[in-house]
């Protein structure tokens, strides 16, 4: 059977099991086997219109149940994310919720402004829940954008997202959000806007469609160094690709700002917004390009940090990725898989970030991004956050390197950075990355044991 058909069947099966879990949770509670086995109960919670949640909590609450962890992603279905059960089995109360955006992935209707209001519902729910004294946000992947933007605005007010440095200002409706007591960014990426930038195909000719590509800028052209078993691009190609990518990014922003001015003056196609389709602009993982094919890019940290091993030990060292090449197929010609289907306003507030002429990235650094030009940027957002911060990276995936960037920008006096050896972006063990079977052990357990220790450290959130 064709590999894509098999993958589609597996994804359908995973979604079926996820929703069966939620239905069981609503009906009476589920306690699957986890790294820790304290029994839990789960309760469906309607936080708002189109904003479902499931509260996971120990059946016999202990001291750690005073901490309520709130989990929400920028667009994905997180009602059964591993944090829901792994942390509740370790004694914490965990509210896992979905925002009100569509979960099909075809259109990107989940504007950051709206999902921030959805997140406010979750924080408010935990704030009034009996027995919860502290609320800690957990952002994974694109959830790092949502949770860091939320906490920055909640601590500092909307003035932090209405300054002249922002591409567009946030609305006043985001004022007055209740702040959390802590923030965990566990394999957050660089932000929705930066991931759109990193996924933008500079080979696309024109902006009317994705079927015509410039072969000299195509990462999937073998003449440029592409190899499905592992690509190696020349320094010249990398420079040309990144320069063209940054140029197209800024051109898209300028064009969208021009359309916004027309819309605001009453001359748009609609009075409130306009549809916008960007060919080769889909930001999801299968479209992340260049560094996903060439593992020498974004391959190690600049400084030494704790690396967590399967046996519970840690070593402070330069952190190298163990990932393998991914993304061997171009989706630029596909509307559903390769294009960003959004609106002018949503693009500018959620997916746009400015870059300078020297935009680039190499083995250990990203250069030339104005992290403060948008509130869709964890590195920019953490500059205003004062509560305790935990940031972690999974070395079996490229997004792990964002953890160092976020940590270096963080204002928090109490901030922690650690990396999990051999974990995928979803915290599971990267078996394809192992040189010997079992080399990395149970990385889910390694990850959540560390999170548990950070949350329950005396004096941080617990007396």
Where are these regions (language model features)?
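Alpha/beta-hydrolase active-site loop
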Residues: 109-130, 145, 149, 162
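Alpha/beta-hydrolase
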Residues: 219-380
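Short beta-strand/loop motif that positions the catalytic acidic residue
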Residues: 385, 391-393
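Short beta-strand element of the alpha/beta-hydrolase
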Residues: 64-74
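Catalytic histidine neighborhood in serine/cysteine hydrolases
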Residues: 411-431
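Catalytic active-site module of serine/aspartate enzymes centered on a nucleophile-bearing elbow/loop
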Residues: 423, 431-463
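N-terminal cap/lid segment of alpha/beta-hydrolase-fold proteins
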Residues: 36-64, 436-441
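Conserved alpha/beta-hydrolase
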Residues: 88-106
């Amino acid at each position: 059977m064709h590999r894509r058909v098999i993958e589609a069947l597996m994804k359908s099966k995973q979604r079926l099991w996820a929703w069966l879990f939620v239905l069981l949770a609503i009906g009476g509670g589920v306690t699957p086997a986890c790294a820790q086995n304290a029994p839990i109960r789960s309760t469906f919670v309607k936080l708002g219109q189109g904003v479902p949640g499931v509260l996971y909590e120990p059946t016999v609450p202990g001291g750690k149940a005073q901490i309520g962890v709130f989990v929400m992603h920028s667009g994905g279905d997180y009602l059964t994310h591993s944090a829901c059960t792994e942390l509740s089995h370790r004694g914490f109360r965990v509210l896992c919720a979905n925002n009100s955006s569509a979960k099909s992935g075809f259109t990107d209707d989940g504007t950051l402004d709206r999902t921030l209001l959805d997140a406010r519902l979750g924080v408010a729910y935990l704030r009034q829940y009996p027995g919860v004294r502290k609320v800690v946000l957990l952002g994974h992947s694109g959830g790092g954008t949502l949770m860091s933007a939320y906490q920055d605005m909640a601590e500092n007010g909307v003035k932090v997202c209405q300054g002249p440095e922002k591409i567009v200002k946030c609305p006043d409706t985001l004022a007055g959000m209740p702040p959390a007591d802590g923030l965990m960014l566990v394999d957050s990426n660089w932000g929705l806007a930066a991931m759109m930038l990193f996924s933008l195909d500079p080979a696309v000719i024109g902006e009317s469609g994705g079927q015509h590509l410039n072969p000299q800028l195509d990462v999937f052209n073998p003449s440029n160094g592409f190899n499905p078993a592992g690509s190696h691009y020349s320094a010249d190609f990398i420079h040309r690709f990144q320069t063209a990518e940054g140029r197209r990014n800024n051109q898209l922003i300028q064009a969208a700002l021009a359309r916004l001015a027309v819309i605001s003056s009453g001359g748009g196609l609609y009075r409130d917004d306009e549809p916008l389709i960007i060919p080769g602009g889909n930001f999801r993982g299968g479209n992340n390009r260049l560094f996903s094919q060439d593992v020498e890019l974004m391959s190690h940290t600049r400084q030494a940090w704790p690396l967590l091993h399967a046996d519970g030990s840690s070593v402070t060292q330069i952190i190298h990725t163990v990932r393998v090449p991914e993304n061997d197929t171009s989706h630029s010609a596909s509307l559903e898989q390769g294009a960003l289907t959004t609106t002018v306003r949503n693009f500018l507030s959620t997916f746009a970030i400015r870059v300078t002429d020297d935009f680039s990235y190499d083995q250990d650094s990203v250069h030339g991004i104005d992290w403060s030009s948008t509130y869709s940027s964890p590195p920019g957002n953490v500059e205003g956050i004062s509560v305790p911060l935990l940031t972690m990276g999974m070395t079996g995936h490229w997004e792990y390197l964002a953890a160092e960037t976020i940590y270096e920008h963080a204002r928090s006096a109490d901030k922690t950075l650690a990396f999990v050896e051999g974990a995928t972006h979803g915290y599971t063990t990267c078996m394809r990355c192992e040189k010997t079977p079992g080399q990395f052990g149970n990385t889910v357990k390694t990850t959540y044991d560390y999170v548990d220790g950070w949350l329950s450290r005396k004096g941080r959130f617990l007396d």
